[in-house]
């Protein structure tokens, strides 16, 4: 299955100070002193030929105030996505779109809509990861009321995206910063999308953050295939991790086979032919940040090249019989394993 190489977008937060609750100044505090434009210059200088476009949170990383400076630093590279920065504002620690307090909810929605308008002015899509929309304790939340407020808020954002001619990508996660995020799995994400479809809103797709799925035990290639079948496969946030926390490690560092099968399913979906990107959502705590991004892209390109070498007709035949042994023979052949020895008596 041949196709042009996927274009890559990078979340600029990969070059941040790497803050944790244990190290509030960050493992790389020198990056905390950089402006967004300085981070972009560092990325562009070290990732020539590796990264095509960039992604930013609004208004914390990119806004009307620093747009000209950042555009100059981008040196011709594009801005592919603007991400809602609600979770970065302490005012919304107990929820923004879902807040039962009208003033808080109005402020969160107004900030998100400003972000949508900003994204539309750039021709960029908008990502909503509702990490603060949830709860931390039993008995803390009026679930039905807060869910209704949340979905109504997402609808308002989606309709503003539609008016601006851009897509809204929803991204789920099970926990952090809210301990129980409302939209915590693929099923709840699809619930939101299908509720919006019933209201006539059709410009919403899914941003698959790989580690968020792995944290849930959600098999990456299965959900890519499902989302593609429903026309919902919008964007990827590529990374890896151990599976229990949002590690945002380099692509292909763990979950290798899952990532390889995902590469195959993305090829089957012709992902990239409609302008989609492989977005990188990385948090290299202690590693050289630019080197970690470069290594992620190089490892992805290798994994994708293996997927391209898998004998697709033969694999389809094996899958029609649910023949796992034959399927792995084909996968390992693509990885360069020697041909299997003949069975005794064959």
Pin down the residues of each PLM region.
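Histidine-acidic metal/acid-base catalytic patches
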Residues: 1-45, 183, 187-208, 212-346
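Short amphipathic alpha-helices and their capping/turn segments at secondary-structure boundaries
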Residues: 1-3, 62-78, 109-122, 151-162, ...
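Active-site acidic/histidine proton-transfer and metal-coordination neighborhood
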Residues: 2-4, 94-205, 215, 329-336
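N-terminal small/glycine-rich loop or linker at the start of catalytic domains
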Residues: 4-26, 85-99, 130-138
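Short coil-to-beta-strand
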Residues: 4-10, 75-88, 120-130, 166, ...
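Active-site loop/lid in soluble adenylation, ligation, and acyl-transfer enzymes
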Residues: 36, 49-60, 88-89
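Conserved beta-strand positions in the central sheet of alpha/beta enzyme cores
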Residues: 52-55, 127-128, 237, 279
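Glycine-rich, proline-tolerant flexible connector loops at the mouths of alpha/beta enzymes
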Residues: 52-70, 137
């Amino acid at each position: 299955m041949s196709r042009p190489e996927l274009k890559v977008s990078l979340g600029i937060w990969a070059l941040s100070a790497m803050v944790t609750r244990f190290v509030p100044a960050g493992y790389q505090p020198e990056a905390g002193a950089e402006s967004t434009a300085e981070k972009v210059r560092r990325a562009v200088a070290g990732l020539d030929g590796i990264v095509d476009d960039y992604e930013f949170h609004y208004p914390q990383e990119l806004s009307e105030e620093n747009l000209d400076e950042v555009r100059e630093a981008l040196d011709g590279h594009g801005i592919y996505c603007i991400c809602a920065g609600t979770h970065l504002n302490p005012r919304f620690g107990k929820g923004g779109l879902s807040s039962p307090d009208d003033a808080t909810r109005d402020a969160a929605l107004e900030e998100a809509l400003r972000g949508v308008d900003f994204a539309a002015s750039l021709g960029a899509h908008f990502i909503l990861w509702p990490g603060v929309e949830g709860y931390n304790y039993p008995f803390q939340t009026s679930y039905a009321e807060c869910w209704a407020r949340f979905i109504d808020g997402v609808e308002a954002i989606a309709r503003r995206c539609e008016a601006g001619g851009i897509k809204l990508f929803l991204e789920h996660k099970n926990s952090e910063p809210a301990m129980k995020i409302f939209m915590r799995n693929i099923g709840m994400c699809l619930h939101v999308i299908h509720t919006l479809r019933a209201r006539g809103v059709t410009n919403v797709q899914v941003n698959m953050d790989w580690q968020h799925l792995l944290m849930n035990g959600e098999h990456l290639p299965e959900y890519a295939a499902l989302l593609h079948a429903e026309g919902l496969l919008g964007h990827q946030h590529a990374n890896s991790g151990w599976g229990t926390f949002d590690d945002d490690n380099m692509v292909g560092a763990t979950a290798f086979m899952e990532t390889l099968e995902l590469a195959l399913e993305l090829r089957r979906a012709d992902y990239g032919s409609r302008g989609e990107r492989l977005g990188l959502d990385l948090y290299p705590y202690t590693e050289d940040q630019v080197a970690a991004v470069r290594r992620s892209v190089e490892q992805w390109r290798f994994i994708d090249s293996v997927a391209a070498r898998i004998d697709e007709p033969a694999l389809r035949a094996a899958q029609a019989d649910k023949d796992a042994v034959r399927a792995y023979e084909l996968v390992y052949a693509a990885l360069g394993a020697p041909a299997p020895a003949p069975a005794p008596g064959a």
